[in-house]
Amino acid sequence: MFSSVKSKVIHVEPVIYDLVLEPFKVHILGCGSALPTLKHSASAQIIEMRGKCFMMDCGEGAQMQFRRTHVHFAKINAIFISHLHGDHCFGLLGLLSTLGMLGRTAKLKVYAPESYGDLFKRQIDFFMQGMEYEIEFVPVDTEKAQVVYEDHSVTVETIPLQHRVPCCGYIFREKPTLPHIRRDMIDYYEIPVSQINNIKNGADWTTKEGDVIPNARLVMPAVSPRSYAYCSDTRFVPGLAEKVKRSEEHTSELQSP
């Protein structure tokens, strides 16, 4: 369903450029309800974007689904938990243990409702003795929309939801990138490499003859950033549709009355 993103081709005269987008994939490892079925595993997803790999919820059976989708355990950069019902988090400790047995050394952050903090620490202290990587618990205020993760290319923002327990969704967003340089214009006007970043950031270019070349002639617009919204179990939330409508894709799990 969300397994791949096609390259977008932008035509600029007189040269044709093919701008290949970085992969943006969502792997649905599980989408079943609280009761197990033979067709669907419990809730778990992997979001691949900008060279990173984020896990969204971790129900039972997630590790087996990793194997089936050929996503490598070692690629996980961070784990996000929407709420503390078992079908969304009972697979977490097993996965963390497996990562340790596979020799992970990189630090891993787990974002989850703040009420899980004390229990999570006790579970890690009891079950994860001797593991050679650090696990950091990051408490999430499920009642507040806020950016909980940010790096140079991606942000993750919470979406307050309404469920029987504290619960939030997450929006994974790409950050805008700089415009793309037109190589034919750079060559034609003999612009030195040292000026490329200035031009990407909006500078015009003045030729040896004193002519000012507008920036718009030297660059192509950047590809629009993409986003993905994950809304787990929730009742009707006024304004929720407005918050996620700008996302290219989204997943929602609705709670029956």
What name fits each language-model region?
Residues 2, 6-7, 12, 16-20, ...:
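Metal-dependent phosphodiesterase/nuclease catalytic metal-binding core
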